[in-house]
């Protein structure tokens, strides 16, 4: 479902775009006529509260008991909200997380969703503390919580929690290069695809992290502008067993 069309991603010095909020109901109506169904529904950036509320309605209409729902609760990064977002958007996203099977927030988003100050000092990134945050987030409703991109020394950690099994799983990779745009989107997209194929969250996260690491290493070697993202296309074979 297209929610907006952008000329380029928003980290560049300028961009233009078209909000498709008014078109989304018409697209959904056409899909409903054709009895479209989905193995998975995956939400990423949503432009505001009204889009979040509409997506909830979309899930009610199009999800069936077998549909896996993934929510990447895009709210902010580096301790601050993205432009135009605030507490109202956070509350709407919190409600949406309650509809999900899997959520994949970064640490800033975790703290916002839990109503905490977004302090990203070392004590906030203690791995034991993060595991406790995951348990708290699971109480919103998702079966699996994966907190992404946690920086610890020379490592980047992605830490998962299965509410059903009351167990944690995690993958760390070497910190490489600068922060590249779109890496969180790639990680969640691979997790989503793998789990819809029937793979476990643990295997999906491991595969996604390895794929992303290889893509970042190529971007570093090629001296790619971080705003351009990473060259993931050359590494798609890593996603196939």
Segments predicted by a language model, with ranges:
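Conserved N-terminal subdomain of the carbohydrate kinase-like
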Residues: 1-71, 75-83, 234-237
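A non-catalytic, amphipathic alpha-helix used as a structural packing/dimerization or gating element
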Residues: 23-26, 95, 132, 203-211
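Short, small-residue alpha-helix embedded
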Residues: 112, 178-201, 205
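Charged C-terminal helix
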Residues: 202-241
